Amino acid sequence: MQNIPELAEIPGAVREEIATFLDQRREQVAEIGAPVTKAVSFLESFVLDGGKRVRPTYAWAGYLAAGRGEEDPTAMLRAAASLEFIQACALIHDDIIDASNTRRGNPTVHRGVEKLHRESEYLGDPEFFGTSVAILVGDLALVYAEDMFQDSGLSAAALHRARSPWRGMRTEVIGGQLLDISLEAAGSESVELANSVNRYKTAAYTIERPLHLGAAIAGASEELIAAFRGYGHDIGIAYQLRDDQLGVFGDPAVTGKPAGDDLREGKRTELLALALQRADESDPHAAATLRKLVGHTSDPQELSRLAQIIADSGAPEEIERRIDSLTQSGLQHLHAAKVDPTVTETLEQLAIKATARRK
């Protein structure tokens, strides 16, 4: 690679690397059998046709900010692109866990496979088949992430430096998901535990670890890595808090997900925990309604009622203040890093985009 891609060019460059990787796997997949080829086509569509490439972009930013070291930019781009397969695994499995029907405005993988089963008039239960295939497709995505990362062309020294963030990121996102569903099962109302989910399921995995990974590959100092991790922690949690707001109040035409999806699924978010605390003090009847219906209704009118109770509690305004505070704190960590002004400006823009988004 003669030209070093700018951060704005990374999403397109990542897509090209993923397409090349999948092309290189076609023969092996075809040898196994036509059903596998068809299953992999769902993964291919998922990773190529959607997504903002947030994680590869942050990994590339960490690499540039640390001065790139002696690593081949092409190898670094492949390593960054591999993060999209981890994201695919996480989302495909997350959609199964949440029984979601849509993702990015399209059918989720398990629903798409379920439709294939019906149209092909296969034997057995279509829903069970769709879930089973989607689990395996998600597993394959995780395998592909490891293959693409290890075969990226990075030096042995760079792979060694990357070992801690690479391992930590995968453990943290799975641990965060486990914590998430455990809180739902327990009906948790803890703000602190909801924040732990935000920390591990989103912040570390979406921003903090990708930045850490890119910087480590380039041989960054411990001081720079610490500054990046501080930025990633704060902006990542703010990103998830914004997601929680959209999960209750977002426009389906913009988000690509049904209105009130988090309420239907019973997500134990910081927004819900705060709303319950405030409603307990100001309107116990409303608090009782929240406890009774969250996670137990799909009725649009009841979901709208729950959203109104949360809005009336004042919790959304408190979440907005927290988003603003975390964004400012994250930017302070970034400015303390004193890296290339162009990279700093881009990371500032990414922070604002992540925390002020509407989808």
Residue spans for each PLM region:
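Transmembrane helix-loop-helix
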Residues: 149-164, 287-292
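Conserved N-terminal diphosphate/IPP-binding helix and adjacent helical/loop segment
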Residues: 1-83, 88, 92, 97-127, ...
